[in-house]
Amino acid sequence: MGNNEHTIVYLIGMGPGNSDCLTREAVQALSQATVCIGASRMLAIWKSLCEEDGRDAEQTFYNAYKAEEIAELIQNHGGETIAVVFSGDIGFYSGAKKLSMMLRKAVGKVCNMVDDTTGTTEQIQADKTIYELCYIPGLSSVQYLFDKIGWAWEDAELISNHGVSANIPAKVLHHAKVGTLLGGENQVAEVCKRLTEVGLGEIAVVVGEWLSYPDEKITKKYAKNLCEETFDKLAVAIFINDHPQPRRLAPGIKDEMFIRGKVPMTKEEVRMVVIAKLGIQEDTGLVKYDQNSGQFVISNPAPVIYDVGAGTGSVSIELALLTERGTVYAIEKKPEAVKLMYANRRRFHAGNMEIIEGEASEVIPSLPAPTHVFIGGNGGNLFKIMDQIYAKNPNARIVLTAVTLETQAEMLTLADIAKRHNVDFNMVQMAVTRSREAGTYHMMQAQNPVWIVTMG
């Protein structure tokens, strides 16, 4: 490359797919480009438009969709005008975000933002080249579907389940309208099965396929009626809940609201303290470059929570409802308790609660590494379970409870384990006294004292 090379990179949103949905600005940028990079479906949009106009697409085309590969191609074409094409809009779950971050890392640092008549561009200075990034919006397929069915999307919850995992049941539970990108031929059915499992089968679902194309298809049914249907792998869906529930901001579900049977349950006041001690935080969604791994990672990832000895699932359900982005693994070996957990999960619509049946020490090795763990029962395998947890994540925060004297004595040895793993250790005793009616009077009745240990 010679001195003072100037490379223009257009990051273009191509809309839902039909060339009629391209903006005039996008067409102008594509016409100026000498190199065009993107997934084959996006490249085909521009090629078909050129054919309709009776001219050849004269650019050099590269079929690529991975940010690393695209960044390398851009560097190999220094001094040229490059168009990188993305489906939908570049600001809505688009690869444009990762690519711009990758370019900053690969070729240099941001020099300045330049305002001109065409909008705001970003300049990145490399050793001998200035890369000018020009961002051109497109029409999102989710926006297109909302408009097609005549629904405003300004007050909708917008998410993506394409290439990432989103807690769709929680979003649907708490919002009247949820628009989402999907990926995979069976994903609509899988999401609807999950909604039905957690008691949300009566939610209305609108599915859009091949949006903007001549064979566009829009289907509207209840979630429970879509569990076996197959849709295009790039389908878009809108979930409509006529009776959304307000989201809980603190624990404290009344004990009597749970289906209990004869299975022991962590009581309301203890649950509140345990959840506070766990100190769970939602992920920020902020993506940063990690020098050690050489990858872009979420700075504060979504919590992965174990509830060991989950019983009726009362703690798991409270946690699931509070941590919309996290996943709670409720681990229980007793069949009667597992049956109750399924019933309670359905009652409270806890879509991010995974029920794991089996002995904790046997199932933990196959689970994702936890960020937080509550141990309410351990089946006599406490130390083995602790070793497994710390092997998966030495920084996991663990809260344990004990009622019997035998378990309390066992917990005293945990101080040594905490010291060995260089984590904080704290133990408190909690005694709750509740009022109860005694004829025309009220009396205070003491509950069993509970020991609560926090490690980490």
Give short role names for the model-derived ranges.
Residues 296-297, 312-324:
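Conserved SAM-binding loop of SAM-dependent methyltransferases across substrates and taxa
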Residues 321-327, 392-394:
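Conserved S-adenosyl-L-methionine
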Residues 284-291, 302-311:
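Conserved class I S-adenosyl-L-methionine
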Residues 7, 18, 88, 92-175, ...:
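Class I SAM-dependent methyltransferase SAM-binding "motif I" and its flanking Rossmann-like core
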Residues 386-449:
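C-terminal substrate-binding/active-site "lid" region of AdoMet-derived donor-dependent transferases
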Residues 1-133, 143, 332, 351-367:
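Class I S-adenosyl-L-methionine
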Residues 7-11, 81-82, 175-263:
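A contiguous loop/helix-start segment that scaffolds small-molecule binding in enzyme catalytic cores
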Residues 341-342:
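Conserved SAM-binding loop
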